[in-house]
Amino acid sequence: MPYTLDEHDQVCVLTIKRRFLGSIERDALQQTVDALIADGRTRLVIDLTKTDFMDSTCVGLLVQGAERLRAADGDARLAGMQTRVKNLFVMARLLGRMFDDYPTVEAALQSFAAPVASRQA
């Protein structure tokens, strides 16, 4: 798998390690999110510091995962996006509407301690 999963103070951190192609990694990512929800672990930081490429299918998978986490009273936040990856989320108008973006994993983890304003689609 091109990612690892760790837990920090009841928040899971999904670190994507390289190029992430949703068409290839779709099933594994969906199974991971499903397992987290089944275990009641619904707060997720997606660490993109090592991700230099992501296709639009992967962006769609992350949106679906975030929606499923929110339906289970959780949330997903993005951390450490490189410019190339961030541009995908900006062009799709997902930052601030679907995802909150943090410069570091630590900042994203700390954000779970503070309330977040509700998003409007």
Where are these regions (language model features)?
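STAS-typified acidic loop motif
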Residues: P2-Q31
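General small-molecule cofactor/ligand-binding pocket signal
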Residues: D6, A79, Y102
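Conserved catalytic submotifs in the C-terminal HATPase_c
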Residues: H8, T49, E106
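Short, conserved active-site loop motifs that form the nucleotide-linked donor/cofactor pocket
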Residues: V11, F99-D100
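Short, solvent-exposed coil/turn elements at secondary-structure transition points
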Residues: V11, R19, Q82, V105-A107
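A short, hydrophobic secondary-structure junction motif
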Residues: C12-L14, T32-L44, A108, F112-P115
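Amphipathic alpha-helical interaction surfaces in cytosolic regulatory modules
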Residues: F20-F99
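A charged, well-structured terminal subsegment
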Residues: D100-A121
